[in-house]
């Protein structure tokens, strides 16, 4: 489906680890800046991939746009939030390939100016199965609760929206459970960077999911 909107898109699969997967995508790029589209992203019809950063276009009047990281908004299908979570991103190829460690959040911590785009790029359809849904909510709410990206009123409003139960969508209960667990983990480890970085270790998250859902007997609470 992505090829409908971006005929030259290249797929990366079978690479373990978020950083290595992103770097594999960078190596496939034939340009200095390249778009990243998550596998669960459903591109909206009004979005296109025609924005090209240049050395002469200045962001905030001072930074060449080709040196920045861009993030477009996405629609969350569970809580209807619209912001950068799960949105299409545009990275600098050379900078991404030079990174040796994935911090808690790559886009906002890779050493380039982070630019939010208000246009909606996609629906972030992460609620495809229990684990994927729980994992997505857990990771994002850990970031929001810890303040690792931004610690302000908007962040708290988003966290509150994630932590509301919506049983009228597929796997809404798992999103709710992941959000609450992520909030607790983020608050507990607010100043513990090694602990926060574990959210990018999917084997660790899988163990947490199994531990928590078993402990609370989640399956018996879902109709």
What are these regions (language model features)?
Residues 1-30:
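N-terminal anchoring/stem segment of glycosyltransferases
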Residues 19-20, 44, 114:
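Short secondary-structure boundary/hinge segments and terminal tails
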Residues 22-23, 31, 45-61:
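Short alpha-helix within the catalytic core of nucleotide-sugar-dependent glycosyltransferases
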Residues 34:
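Short aromatic/hydrophobic "clamp" motif used to bind/position activated sugar donors
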Residues 38-42:
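The conserved acidic donor/metal-binding loop of glycosyltransferases
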Residues 51-223:
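Catalytic-site signature of metal-activated, phosphate-bearing donor transferases
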């Amino acid at each position: 489906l992505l090829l409908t909107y971006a005929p030259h898109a290249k797929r990366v699969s079978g690479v373990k680890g978020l950083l290595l997967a992103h770097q594999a995508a960078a190596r496939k790029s034939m340009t200095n800046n390249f778009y990243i589209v998550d596998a669960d992203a459903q591109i909206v019809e009004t979005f296109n991939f025609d924005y090209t950063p240049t050395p002469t276009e200045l962001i905030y009047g001072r930074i060449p746009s080709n040196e920045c990281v861009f993030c477009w908004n996405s629609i969350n299908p569970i809580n209807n939030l619209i912001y950068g979570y799960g949105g299409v991103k545009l990275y600098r190829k050379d900078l991404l390939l030079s990174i040796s460690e994935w911090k808690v959040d790559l886009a906002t911590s890779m050493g380039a100016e982070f630019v939010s785009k208000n246009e909606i790029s996609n629906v972030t359809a992460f609620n495809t199965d229990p684990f994927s849904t729980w994992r997505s909510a857990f990771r994002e709410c850990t970031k929001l609760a810890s303040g690792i990206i931004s610690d302000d009123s908007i962040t708290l409003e988003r966290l509150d929206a994630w932590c509301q139960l919506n049983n009228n969508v597929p796997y809404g209960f798992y999103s709710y459970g992941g959000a609450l667990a992520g909030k607790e983990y983020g608050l507990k480890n607010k100043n513990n960077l090694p602990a926060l970085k574990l959210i990018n270790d999917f084997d660790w998250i899988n163990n947490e999911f199994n531990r928590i859902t078993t402990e609370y007997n989640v399956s018996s609470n879902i109709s």
